[in-house]
A protein has these predicted regions:
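N-terminal and secondary-structure boundary signal
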Residues: 1-357
Length: 357
């Protein structure tokens, strides 16, 4: 049986990051892999978390998605109207706020330039899927855009850490294709499944490392359950600028210049996690995937290639690609309080981030 393949592009960035660093890297790796949609319309699902600013490190950079659009339109001959960018917002988000979130994250400008549609996945309903062999989620609502066999669904997460899952990669990004939105509150659902509905336990001040890892284990099962219900056609992680910390407004941005891509989502997450500094030995998410027979047991079970200038070359050592320093997660638990000073904190409502749609 052949091994799954994962592809890495590492862009050398000497100066200040520019939009073209994101755009050109995305297009280059797709050209090298020769990704084809086989005539299907394309739907890309980036991580556009709560409309965070385009250069915050929190969202998949819009210029990276713009590079993917260029690949399908300019290299594959798709009409821009057949290439979609989708995300699902909270059920409490008004249409005006939804538009502002797209605008603040840079996607409105990108979509206008590339002439591609932005879609709210929740507006199109779902398909209920009962995949079997699930642990926490058994009847899962999946966006019609992700479930439709006539759509080429591309999962486009950001290379960053997360205060619960530890990493935010392909598996976590798939929460955004869970419809209706009320069913994707997995952090709180995992809390209740792990600790019960004990209203006396609020926040994380009481939480030890073992408690947090138990919570991680529950949400990891949920993410793998969603994977069994919906496997993306292709996965590509934007790590041109990575981010550690708590996934949101406490963290550090790293110019890593990395893109990690492949057809097999679990293998992409194994490799991306390793480049951040996490392995199957120290990441509960991957441990659960291995235990369930979904993830490769060892990174050696994956064929990993570098992509540069259209050339595909087998990688013998991942050391030159691994982040230095490695990514540090901030879990908001007492064990992590001593390292809070490592991270920068900024206000998402600062005046410099306020723009109109």
């Amino acid at each position: 049986m052949s091994k799954p393949e994962v592809y890495i592009l590492k862009r050398n960035i000497a100066g200040v990051l520019e939009d073209r660093d994101f755009e050109e890297s995305a297009r280059e790796i797709m050209q090298g892999i020769h990704v084809q949609s086989d005539g299907r319309d394309v739907m890309m699902k980036p991580n556009v978390a709560a409309g965070a600013p385009r250069n915050s490190g929190i969202v998949t950079h819009p210029s990276f998605v713009g590079g993917l659009v260029d690949y399908f339109v300019k290299d594959c001959g798709h009409s821009p109207s057949d290439v979609y960018v989708g995300e699902a917002s909270s059920r409490n988000t008004s249409p005006a706020q939804r538009d502002l979130d797209w605008a603040r994250s840079g996607y409105t400008e990108m979509a206008r330039e590339k002439r591609v549609p932005l879609i709210e996945l929740a507006d199109y309903g779902n398909v209920r899927i009962t995949p079997g062999n699930t642990v926490q989620l058994h009847n899962i609502g999946i966006s019609r855009w992700a479930a439709d066999d006539h759509i080429f669904y591309i999962n486009v997460p950001k290379l960053k850490t997360h205060n619960l899952g530890v990493v935010t990669l392909c598996g976590k990004n798939q929460q955004g294709v869970m419809i209706p939105v009320v069913e994707r509150h997995l952090c709180s659902d995992a809390w209740n499944a792990t600790f019960g509905r004990d209203t006396k336990r609020q926040g994380r001040e009481w939480m030890g490392v073992e408690d947090h890892e138990a919570w991680q284990r529950t949400i990891a099962h949920m993410h793998w359950d969603v994977y069994l219900a919906c496997q993306p056609d292709f996965n590509i992680v934007e790590g041109i600028m990575g981010r550690d910390g708590n996934a949101f407004y406490l963290g550090r941005n790293f110019t890593t210049g990395l893109v990690i891509a492949g057809y097999h989502m679990p293998s992409v997450d194994v490799v991306a996690s390793y480049l951040m500094g996490y392995t199957i030995d120290n990441l509960v998410y991957l441990q659960v995937g291995v235990e369930r027979g979904i993830c490769p047991e060892h990174i050696e079970d994956i064929d990993i290639f570098s992509m540069m200038d259209g050339d595909k070359k087998k990688i013998d050592s991942l050391s030159p690609y691994r982040a230095d320093p490695t990514f540090e997660v901030y879990r908001d638990i007492p064990a992590d309080y001593p390292k809070k000073s490592l991270f920068d904190e900024y206000d998402p409502n600062a005046e410099t981030f306020q723009i109109s749609a």
